[in-house]
């Protein structure tokens, strides 16, 4: 349990990506994907600063510095995907890194889609979709599956299943999960309880209005600890 406060900080680092106010901007006359990926991986803060509109630059710089501080060796991979709409562009972004905390080595993996439009040679209206971030110290010994939908209809019920595939036998595991749609999660604690069923299984209802719902949780196991964050887009039609 002594690792939970630090893990909570790691979860926070990536939750901020959900909010569209942190839209990335850059001149579209150059290869945005390649230059952005290079700037992130070389920690070129001055170059990264040039990618953002003036009013957002300081906020983005602050957030990026937090990631660098907690995962100094993090690596970013950006792939270009086709947009669903003619003017919409999509990047598929993956972030990997590791960090030793209190003698334990934690591995970060984050995957998400970044959707945006271009206007006046700038990328704007950026949104993070289908985010899944895990931080774990089990060396991937725990066979775990996250069955959480990418998007659901407003007002409908949907299932959240975090499944441990291997039989538990006499093993004792514990875990918990919370949901939030804004920074109210900073005031919430994740209650850790025994998981006799071999995972976390929950049925919930989507909000009545379009939104992005975020689920964050922890699972503790004799092999290690896994923290996770997953976004669910709530839409009026699929």
What are these regions (language model features)?
Residues 194-202:
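Aromatic sugar-binding surface patches on proteins
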Residues 205-212:
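Surface-exposed, short loops/turns at beta-strand junctions within beta-sandwich domains
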Residues 220-229:
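Short acidic/polar inter-strand loop motif in beta-rich domains
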Residues 106-143:
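Short beta-strand edge/turn micro-motifs at domain boundaries
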């Amino acid at each position: 349990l002594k690792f939970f406060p630090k893990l909570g900080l790691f979860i926070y680092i990536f939750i901020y990506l959900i909010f569209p106010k942190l839209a990335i901007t850059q001149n579209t006359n150059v290869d945005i994907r390649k230059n952005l990926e290079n700037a992130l991986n070389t920690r070129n803060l001055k170059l990264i600063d040039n990618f953002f509109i003036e009013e957002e630059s300081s906020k983005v710089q602050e957030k990026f510095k937090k990631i660098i501080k907690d995962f100094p060796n993090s690596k970013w991979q950006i792939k270009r995907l086709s947009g669903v709409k003619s003017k919409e562009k999509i990047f598929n972004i993956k972030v990997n890194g590791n960090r030793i905390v209190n003698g334990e080595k934690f591995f970060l993996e984050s995957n998400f889609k970044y959707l945006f439009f271009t206007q006046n040679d700038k990328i704007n209206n950026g949104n993070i979709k289908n985010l899944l971030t895990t931080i774990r110290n089990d060396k991937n010994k725990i066979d775990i599956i996250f069955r959480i939908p990418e998007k659901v209809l407003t007002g409908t019920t949907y299932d959240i299943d975090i499944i441990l595939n291997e039989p538990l036998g006499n093993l004792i595991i514990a875990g918990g999960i919370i949901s939030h749609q804004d920074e109210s999660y900073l005031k919430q604690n994740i209650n850790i309880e025994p998981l006799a069923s071999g995972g976390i299984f929950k049925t919930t209802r989507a909000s009545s209005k379009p939104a992005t719902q975020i689920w964050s949780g922890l699972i503790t196991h004799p092999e290690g600890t896994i923290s996770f964050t997953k976004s669910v887009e709530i839409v009026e039609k699929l």
